[in-house]
Amino acid sequence: MENFPTEYFLNTSVRLLEYIRYRDSNYTREERIENLHYAYNKAAHHFAQPRQQQMLKVDPKRLQASLQTIVGMVVYSWAKVSKECMADLSIHYTYTLVLDDSSDDPHPAMLNYFDDLQAGREQAHPWWALVNEHFPNVLRHFGPFCSLNLIRSTMDFFEGCWIEQYNFGGFPGSDDYPQFLRRMNGLGHCVGASLWPKELFDERKNFLEITTAVAQMENWMVWVNDLMSFYKEFDDERDQISLVKNFVTCHEITLDEALEKLTQETLHSSKQMVAVFADKDPQVMDTIECFMHGYVTWHLCDARYRLHEIYEKVKDQDTEDAKKFCKFFEQAANVGAVAPSEWAYPQVAHLANVRAKGDVKEAQKPILSSIELVE
């Protein structure tokens, strides 16, 4: 395995953060912890229900880690929406992460998908059954146009995960395949449309801005994720079907060339995102900026992405990019580094056990000693 291109990664990250003028001021520390705990608590109780536990069949530690990651993403990035909307989105996106980590073949349970949908019957696929049950709680926050985007993008995501079950990075020469798969499983339209709850935005009045935001967010959000995930995925056997690796296969180029391709497209998208909305509705621009900055903070601070390892590796280096990266990392950590023990309690497994015993009051107590074990 070749060595990770640290210097290149530092330069790319610094340029990205400079392009978006990174300065996360979305919350005070108290507000961040309050929103994290509210969204987490509602979502944890949701996934602790017997039906969810029985149908999802997810390892408790994996479910706990997935929920904490997603709550962080939503709270940090969807800074303008209500706490209730944050909680409902956290549940929805946790379902998507659970599916993304699944290895079950969806084919048998999807044979009668449309017939069941048309007849109003419960879906045979357990993931769809649970997601459809929760969808009204999500869609109540949005107008019909944004809701349609959420539904359609979630269906695309399911199909993208289905394709990934085959561990297929594309045929050499199939230049369209990498971006096709990344758009399919990126949830870009779902994310882009879920920034505009109807209590804050009239989707008819802001239709053009919202449509453009959905279009721009489709690429920006997934490309930034791919760049910030590149380190953790570099030598992980489970993450070899990535956009960068698929560029290598389909475009028949080197890994360095593939990373440069992603870098240039991400930086161009970042420039566009800032420029296009600079003279538009100030509330729209503020929402987009808060999302961009919060999304970056989440990546820099969430243990899943292991970027603290890069920081520790280069913090004593004297290069300009190393110093800039460390400054940005410290800036993010100052606002976003919040220990799970401060908000992610009680654990889902504990709630599920308490529900089984019927002791609801006991379920409200924090269990800080065990929560620290979950990254």
UniProtKB/Swiss-Prot annotation:
InterPro entries registered for this protein in UniProt: Isoprenoid_synthase_dom_sf (IPR008949), TRI5_ascomyc (IPR010458), Trichodiene_synth (IPR024652)
Reactions the enzyme catalyzes: (2E,6E)-farnesyl diphosphate = trichodiene + diphosphate
EC number(s) given by UniProt: 4.2.3.6
Keyword Iron-sulfur on entry: no
Gene Ontology biological process terms from the UniProt entry: sesquiterpenoid biosynthetic process
UniProt key word Iron: no
Molecular function GO terms recorded: trichodiene synthase activity
Pathway(s) this gene product operates in, as recorded in its UniProt entry: Sesquiterpene biosynthesis; trichothecene biosynthesis
Function of the protein: TS is a member of the terpene cyclase group of enzymes. It catalyzes the isomerization and cyclization of farnesyl pyro-phosphate to form trichodiene, the first cyclic intermediate in the biosynthetic pathway for trichothecenes. It serves to branch trichothecene biosynthesis from the isoprenoid pathway.
Similarity-based family: Belongs to the trichodiene synthase family.
Annotated protein name in UniProt: Trichodiene synthase
Biological source species: Fusarium asiaticum
